[in-house]
């Protein structure tokens, strides 16, 4: 199947008509077609069968009817593709439109989301990915939450791993050692006795290590107050910061206009946990950090994440002020851990000053492909990126 797709890469692709595929399972043909909004219920059931968290109808409305990036296109882009056998969905890949900028150049981007295929039909699942990469009028293809197997598929379609250094390494601070270690024990599926004893001992060691090594933000920035607002309070001053950021050194940046920020972080099922920390000087917005908090339903781990952060000239003093505020916010809302994923080296260096712990993904979760070979080569330089959890679908489904 993969070889056949490679041969056909140069063939124009259009899915206004269904495509019939052959599967080794049974005799019924597999149909590949564009997803419809009316497929929501069937996609939800498919995700549940595949062990994935289902989406909400409200989030579908947000992603494919209220997305600011869709207003910039001259045609209606597919919301995704499905595999269908005798009227039953057996595969799905969502397709989310995004706007990016590289210097003064506007780019149309898409990111895959919610990839789900029943095991019996994995042999034809690559047709979903082929449809994604054969879209017309796209400058940049992104995959930002890939497990190892999905990463291999992305490489087969000539996507490359993100060259930004250490994106796959998460920096984190433990805020509540006991609750953190209890969540780890649950993930390891130990017996209640071992979990209790092991958790007590580990949390004691972890707490001691945190104090001895001073693993928390300690140095504030005098004269740089930080305030907290809701997503719906993101105003015109964010537009000024965004415009200034675009004039700095050329880097690939997802659209951070006020409308794009509000759309991204106003998640229907979020219940108001997304907050924005703002650092201002005499009313001038110097930078912001968006914080998302959630709880793992299996382990009980409460996590806060720096989902995005934008600061004038990447000023270390402003970054420190925002990170200290993020740490204090995470403690205040009862999170067990605060995480930082991604960001360029200069920003990670500021985070690392406070002796964070580190954990690494088993494989790179972020892949990209630019339609223009020259642009793709430009993006092979890690310095051209400003990749954060704001990119792709990393926090769109948080």
Mark where each language-model region is.
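Conserved N-terminal entry element of GNAT/NAT acetyltransferase domains
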Residues: 2, 7-38, 205-236
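Active-site/acyl-donor-binding loops of N-acyltransferases
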Residues: 2, 13-20, 62-63, 140-213, ...
């Amino acid at each position: 199947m993969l070889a056949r797709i490679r041969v056909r890469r140069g063939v124009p692709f259009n899915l206004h008509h269904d495509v019939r595929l052959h599967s080794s399972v049974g005799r019924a043909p597999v149909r590949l077609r564009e997803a419809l909004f009316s497929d929501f219920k069937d996609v939800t059931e498919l995700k549940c069968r595949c062990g994935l968290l289902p989406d909400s109808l409200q989030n579908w409305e947000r992603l494919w009817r209220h997305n600011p990036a869709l207003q910039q296109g001259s045609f209606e882009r597919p919301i995704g593709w499905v595999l269908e056998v005798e009227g039953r969905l057996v595969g799905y890949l969502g397709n989310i439109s995004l706007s990016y900028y590289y210097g003064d150049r506007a780019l149309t981007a898409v990111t895959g989301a919610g990839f789900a295929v029943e095991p019996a039909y994995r042999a034809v699942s690559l047709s979903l990915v082929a449809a994604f990469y054969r879209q017309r009028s796209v400058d940049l293809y992104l995959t930002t939450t890939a497990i190892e197997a999905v990463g291999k598929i992305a490489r087969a379609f000539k996507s490359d791993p993100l060259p930004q250094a250490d994106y796959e390494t998460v920096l984190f601070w433990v805020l509540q050692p006991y609750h953190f270690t209890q969540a780890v024990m649950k993930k390891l599926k130990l017996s209640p006795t071992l979990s209790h004893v092991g958790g007590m001992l580990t949390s004691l060691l972890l707490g001691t290590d945190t104090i001895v090594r001073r693993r928390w933000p300690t140095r504030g920035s005098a004269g740089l107050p930080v305030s907290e607002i809701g997503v719906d309070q993101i105003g015109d001053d964010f537009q000024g910061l965004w415009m200034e950021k675009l004039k700095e050194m050329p880097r690939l940046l997802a659209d951070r206009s006020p409308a794009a920020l509000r759309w991204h972080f106003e998640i229907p099922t979020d219940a108001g946990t997304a907050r924005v920390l703002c650092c201002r000087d005499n009313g001038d917005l110097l930078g912001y950090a968006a914080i998302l908090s959630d709880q793992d339903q299996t382990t009980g781990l409460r996590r806060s994440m720096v989902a995005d952060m934008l600061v004038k000239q990447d000023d270390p003093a402003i970054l420190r002020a925002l990170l200290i505020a993020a740490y204090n916010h995470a403690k205040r809302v009862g999170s067990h851990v605060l995480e930082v994923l991604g960001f360029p080296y200069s920003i990670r260096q500021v985070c690392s000053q406070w002796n964070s712990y580190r954990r690494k993904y088993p494989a790179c979760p972020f892949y990209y492909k630019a339609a223009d070979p020259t642009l793709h080569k430009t993006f092979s330089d890690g310095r051209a990126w400003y990749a954060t959890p704001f990119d792709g679908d990393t926090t769109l489904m948080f």
